[in-house]
Amino acid sequence: MKVILVKDVKNVGKAGEVVNVSDGYGRNYLIPKGLAIEATESNLKMLNEKKKAEERKRQQELEQAKELAQKLSKVGVTLKVKAGENGKLFGSVTSKDVEEALKEKGFEIDKKKIVLPENIKTTGTYYAEIKLYQGVTAKVQVDVVAE
């Protein structure tokens, strides 16, 4: 019996796959528990349409991420921080500080996506890498100046 898995099933397959299982396993376990649906022509057509829609959505998200990466690469951020002698900061600049500075410029980016090369503890120019999407990153210049 061919079924389309609705959810991941251990030792059978992942959601969205069409798998061949024994009739009893399909009718008595997978279908009643909502783990699979029977692989009829209409269900297969629906699955293909769903996959195409997901692919279109992924493409759209990728395009948006590339667009945002271009905009971000042109933006620089200046952070004014209290510093002592020789440009040594009191504390350090974190991804949260960069997130807030980007928010002021109109970019909503989660701090978890911002990767700093190291903890910034001195004044100077650094580059933060922002991971926007799978394989799409943007580099933002971060200038740290004494207050």
From Swiss-Prot:
List the keywords (alphabetical). Answer: Ribonucleoprotein, Ribosomal protein, RNA-binding, rRNA-binding
A Gene Ontology molecular-function term?
Answer: rRNA binding
Task: Note the InterPro entries from the entry.
Answer: Ribosomal_bL9 (IPR000244), Ribosomal_bL9/RNase_H1_N (IPR009027), Ribosomal_bL9_bac/chp (IPR020594), Ribosomal_bL9_C (IPR020069), Ribosomal_bL9_C_sf (IPR036791), Ribosomal_bL9_N (IPR020070), Ribosomal_bL9_N_sf (IPR036935)
Query: What SUPFAM superfamilies does the record point to?
Result: L9 N-domain-like, Ribosomal protein L9 C-domain
For biological process, the GO terms are: translation
Query: How is this protein annotated for GO cellular component?
Result: ribonucleoprotein complex; ribosome
Q: Which residues form the signal peptide?
A: none
Please tell me whether the keyword Transferase is annotated for this protein.
no
RNA-binding: present as a keyword of the record?
A: yes
The entry's function note states: Binds to the 23S rRNA.
Q: Per its UniProt record, what NCBIfam families does this chain match?
A: L9
Similarity field? Belongs to the bacterial ribosomal protein bL9 family.
Q: What is this protein called?
A: Large ribosomal subunit protein bL9
